[in-house]
């Protein structure tokens, strides 16, 4: 707040935009989907796209999306039924469906993409499930809303549908005669 206020005070007509790269929500129900699926007899590998070494923010590498690589394609239908039966899973998409819907590289996202239910996340846990009040994460359908604060915006609120619209509008404004 102090730095934005100072910037505004020193440049009162300046357009200032503050946004984020994604939304964030509390997730109280975490599932180690790989452990649950393996206990049910499925041979698979689960990859959370959020996975990184910065564990201060994601202690359990938790996120709202999971790429699933099945080792036995003959069990596809059985796997889909199993995944859909888990309360933490809201959607089960084939790689082709996920690639088309979310502009993902189909060859790199496994056989299936799982999307978490509200308040849930896929996580790397020592057990199968964990209820916690300490997890805030992103990567599900419920973090698509991104905050935008604008001081002297170049256009009205309806013009800013995507974060990329900020740059497009400012560049357009600069190049207009």
Write out the residue ranges for each language-model feature.
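Feature captures the catalytic ectodomains and active-site-proximal regions of enzymes
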Residues: 1-177
């Amino acid at each position: 707040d102090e730095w934005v206020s100072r910037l505004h005070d020193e440049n009162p007509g300046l357009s200032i935009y503050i946004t984020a790269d994604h939304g964030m929500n509390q997730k109280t129900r975490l599932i180690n989907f790989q452990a649950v699926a393996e206990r049910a007899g499925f041979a698979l590998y689960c990859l959370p796209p959020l996975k990184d070494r910065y564990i201060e923010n994601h202690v359990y590498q938790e996120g709202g999306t999971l790429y699933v690589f099945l080792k036995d394609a003959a069990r596809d239908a059985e796997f889909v039924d199993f995944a859909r039966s888990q309360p933490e899973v809201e959607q089960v998409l084939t790689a082709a469906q996920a690639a088309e819907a979310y502009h993902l590289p189909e060859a790199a996202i496994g056989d299936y993409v799982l999307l978490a239910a509200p308040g849930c996340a896929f996580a790397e846990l020592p057990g199968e499930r964990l209820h916690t009040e300490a997890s805030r994460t992103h990567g599900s359908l419920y973090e698509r809303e991104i905050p935008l604060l604008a001081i002297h915006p170049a256009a009205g609120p309806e013009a800013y549908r995507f974060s990329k619209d900020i740059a497009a509008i400012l560049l357009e404004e600069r190049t207009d005669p």
